[in-house]
Regions:
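Conserved, well-structured interaction surfaces
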Residues: 52, 56, 68-78, 162, ...
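Active-site lining segments of carbohydrate-active enzymes
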Residues: 39-49, 117-230, 237-241
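Hydrophobic packing residues in well-ordered alpha-helices of helical domains and bundles
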Residues: 55, 92, 99, 195-198, ...
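Conserved long hydrophobic alpha-helices within structured protein cores
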Residues: 57-68, 206
Length: 241
């Protein structure tokens, strides 16, 4: 339970530590063959680090690790916070609240079959210290008015003055599939309608990985530093379980 303090602190969309909202205009699609420039509602999730980028690859890993911990030791987790992350029990284990927070965001990052998104924002975020509710970085949509949302195109995307080494979609698709499949089992007793929704999406996400094997790396605009994931087989194996 102690580690969940950190997860609540990292929440995006609404942050219970600040008792304020942030990044509520996210975001605008990039790299999609027909939807680039359109708005997509991808509020929620967690900030990746001390910056405010958000990645499917790291968020899905965090979600799955929490789900696995709860699945193996459900009696180890208490209920001292509500779903918004405020003090006060709500009848749901706090770790399940946090799992649900993450899965809600992951669901937004997969709005339709074959439409998977890998990342919100990029290293243009690295523009000085500020709290998330004071983030006014301008990505071309106006200061603080929305950030880019990177579509899993399966093709190389920007990496500073270079391109990343993306070869497919499977590494990300497998993560969606595994999180949705296990998440549906864990949430069915608490959020049955949402559990059914993500359960239906699990196979579609997996099939997208089958169609587009390969690794889906993250993107950067100003520097060459990214998550250089090059393995995708393990993600698809977990998604198939």
């Amino acid at each position: 339970d102690y580690l969940l303090h950190y997860m609540r602190q990292q929440r995006c969309g609404y942050n219970p530590f600040l008792k304020d909202s942030c990044h509520v205009h996210d975001g605008y699609i990039v790299y999609h063959p027909t939807k680039t420039g359109q708005h997509i509602d991808v509020r929620g999730g967690w900030h990746d680090a001390t910056d405010y980028l958000q990645y499917t690859t790291t968020s899905a890993n965090a979600i799955y690790q929490m789900m696995f911990a709860y699945q193996e030791n459900p009696e180890s987790f208490g209920d001292a916070y509500d779903a918004a992350g405020h003090p006060g029990a709500n009848g749901i284990p706090d770790i399940v609240d946090e799992i649900n927070w993450g899965l809600d965001w992951l669901n937004r990052m997969n709005p339709a079959p074959g439409e998977l998104y890998n990342q919100i924002a990029d290293d243009r975020d690295h523009a000085g210290m500020r709290l998330p509710n004071k983030d006014l970085v301008d990505y071309g949509y106006g200061p603080g008015k929305g950030r880019p949302v990177y579509f899993c195109s399966g093709e190389p995307q920007v990496r500073g003055e270079f391109k990343n080494a993306t070869t497919g979609v499977a590494s990300t698709a497998g993560k969606f599939a595994s999180c949705f499949a296990l998440g549906a089992k864990i949430l069915k007793d608490y959020y049955p309608e949402f559990a059914a929704e993500i359960e239906a999406k699990a196979d579609a996400a997996y099939q997208e990985g089958v169609k587009k094997p390969g690794a889906c790396q993250t993107a950067s605009v100003l520097s060459p530093y990214i998550y250089e994931e090059d393995n995708w087989v393990d993600d698809m194996e977990l998604g198939a379980m």
